[in-house]
């Protein structure tokens, strides 16, 4: 269930999941422990975990792809033999490096998917990709009606979402841009990345896990 409210005194729209702003700089919370970023920045299990700005941004970009698509189109799952090839070798016998186990194999052009969902220095405002494919296929008109209502809030200036960058600038024109995108061909962007989510949605619907009736 999506919950949102408009805080009048700060002119800020608070949302749970539906609208997010994604940028290339990792959230500051990773400064306490950047290990997840550094782990995902590698291409093989035997690569050392090096802490630098480039590795943090690379790891963050891949985490964004995971959270947006669950199984991105540019990601392959290697064989078990490849996964454990470097495990438990010297220098890798520790939890931080996950003992050299690395079950991911990224295509060389994996970064191409980021163009549509990540801003370089300014958060890219969008409907959360995972919800776009798992929740909103059957409730597109409900989503549009909600955005039309939000657009009427006077003096709206900021957005705080439960995920990714916050607060970010968010005004009537940003809301209208989302509406226009939903009503355009761009709404079905990145078909290769969305393939897993689309198939998952169909399966959940067939099993009755996703109810046929839309609750508003």
Predicted segment positions?
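Core dinuclear metal-dependent hydrolase active-site scaffold
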Residues: 1-14, 18-29, 35, 67-69
């Amino acid at each position: 269930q999506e919950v949102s409210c408009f805080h009048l005194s700060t002119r800020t729209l608070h949302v749970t999941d539906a609208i997010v702003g994604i940028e290339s700089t990792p959230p500051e919370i990773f400064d306490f422990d950047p290990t997840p970023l550094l782990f995902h920045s590698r291409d093989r299990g035997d690569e050392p975990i090096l802490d630098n700005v480039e590795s943090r941004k690379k790891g963050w970009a891949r985490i964004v792809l995971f959270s947006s698509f669950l199984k991105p189109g540019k990601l392959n799952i290697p064989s078990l033999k490849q996964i454990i090839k470097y495990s438990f070798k010297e220098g890798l016998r520790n939890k931080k490096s996950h003992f050299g186990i690395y079950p991911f194999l990224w295509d060389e052009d994996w970064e191409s998917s980021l163009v549509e969902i990540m801003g370089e220095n300014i958060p890219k405002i969008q409907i959360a990709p995972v919800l776009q494919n798992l929740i909103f296929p059957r409730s597109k008109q409900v989503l549009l009606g909600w955005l039309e209502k939000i657009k009427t809030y006077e003096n709206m200036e900021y957005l705080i979402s439960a995920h990714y960058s916050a607060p970010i600038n968010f005004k009537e024109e940003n809301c209208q841009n989302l509406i226009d995108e939903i009503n355009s061909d761009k709404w079905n962007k990145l078909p290769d990345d969305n393939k897993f989510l689309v198939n998952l949605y169909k399966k959940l619907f067939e099993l009755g896990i996703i109810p046929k009736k839309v609750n508003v």
